[in-house]
């Protein structure tokens, strides 16, 4: 809607809806975005959406993008919806756009894959302390997995599997 450029500081500030495309072809949509060409940082303290090269959607309350390192950082309510409609929620995230790698904490992953669902009522999910996700492997640390449907009053599922490390190999599907 409106933008200002401060030539001495090499800072571009937008007001209202703004769309930015990074060198790695990530699309940032948000408002009140600041591009600091001296510090090589793009950031916003407003709700934003990032679309990656694989069409995964990343929703953030705020973000900082380190241009030279190709890294997005965010703290707050973060949600990723992938192309298979799986949902990942985080409290903190780092995304390396060169390596196509995601590191996050306080992860809640809700899987939509029918291969997990023995019964239509199944709600496969993994909650973990942290996640490292890339094209080859997903590694959940200190995680708990269940297929069970949600229970009233946020009760624990009737069964679950816990592990210090849960590994999913995307290529081998194991």
What are these model-predicted stretches?
Residues 1-174:
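Structural signature for solvent-exposed beta-strand/loop edge elements and short helix-capping sites
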């Amino acid at each position: 809607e409106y933008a200002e450029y401060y030539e001495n500081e090499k800072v571009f500030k937008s007001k209202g809806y703004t769309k930015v495309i990074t060198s790695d072809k990530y699309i940032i949509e948000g408002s009140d975005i600041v591009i600091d060409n001296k510090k090589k940082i793009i950031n916003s303290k407003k709700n934003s959406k990032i679309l990656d090269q694989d069409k995964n959607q990343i929703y953030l309350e705020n973000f900082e993008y380190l241009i030279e390192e190709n890294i997005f950082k965010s703290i707050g309510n973060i949600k990723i919806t992938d192309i298979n409609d799986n949902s990942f929620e985080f409290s903190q995230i780092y995304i390396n756009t060169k390596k196509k790698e995601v590191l996050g904490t306080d992860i809640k992953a809700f899987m939509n894959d029918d291969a997990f669902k023995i019964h239509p009522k199944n709600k496969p999910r993994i909650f973990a302390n942290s996640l490292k996700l890339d094209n080859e492997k997903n590694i959940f640390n200190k995680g708990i997995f269940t297929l069970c449907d949600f229970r009233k009053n946020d009760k624990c599922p009737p069964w679950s599997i816990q592990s210090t490390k849960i590994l999913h190999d995307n290529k081998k599907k194991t």
